[in-house]
Amino acid sequence: MSPKTIVFITGAFVHHSCWDEWKKYFERAGFNTLAPPWPFKDASPEALRNSHPNPEIASNRLATLIDHYERIIKQLPENPILIGHSIGGLIVQVLLQRGLGSAGVAIHSVPPRGIITFKASFLKAGWGPLGFFTSTKRSFLMSFEQWQYAFTNGMDCEAQKEGYYNYAIPESKLIVRDTLSKAAKEIGRAHV
């Protein structure tokens, strides 16, 4: 029997409503879909931005986020198809390693630990979110200029503004840092 449930996993800095059009598409094709928010992020993008700096969001860690999605998946009647973007793509890989998905799609995934680039563009985009030399008790909210550079550099200015208003939210610096830790390491299960 083919799975009929899809779980969408959001990346960092982006509200889970970014999956709304994807959900509609797959629901029209007969799938059940979920796009659960990350812990402490079940509010509108505007409300989350207005809550910045948010110590609860700042406390999120990659391992607890992976466990959050594991709990959601284990409550489902079947192993779902997993689709994730960025850190969500990395989470998809880890969940598949744990046998918690029937299939997975990682869109522009953050790579597992041990795979890194030192390109200037990557370092520029990642320096602020990594939050070195700043308090990890404060969430990080990209400025519009950082959003333009790191997320929407191929879009016209109006689309960039719309994307920022509709989707940009504060993030935990610890989650971004954790992508460099053992929490982000694949454990070697076969890939197809």
Label for each model-derived stretch:
Residues P3-A47:
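Short, surface-exposed "cap/lid" segments of acyl-processing enzymes
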Residues F8-A12, S86, S109:
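Glycine-rich His-Gly loop
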Residues E21, V94-L95:
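Active-site signature of alpha/beta-hydrolase-fold catalytic machinery across serine-
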Residues P53-Q75:
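Alpha/beta-hydrolase active-site loop
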Residues I83-G88, V92:
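Gly/Ala-rich beta-loop-alpha elbow adjacent to hydrolase catalytic centers
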Residues G101-T136, I175-A183:
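Flexible "cap/lid" loop of the alpha/beta hydrolase fold
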Residues L141-V176:
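Conserved alpha/beta-hydrolase catalytic His-Asp/Glu region
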Residues A190-V192:
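Conserved small/polar residues in nucleotide/adenosyl-binding loops
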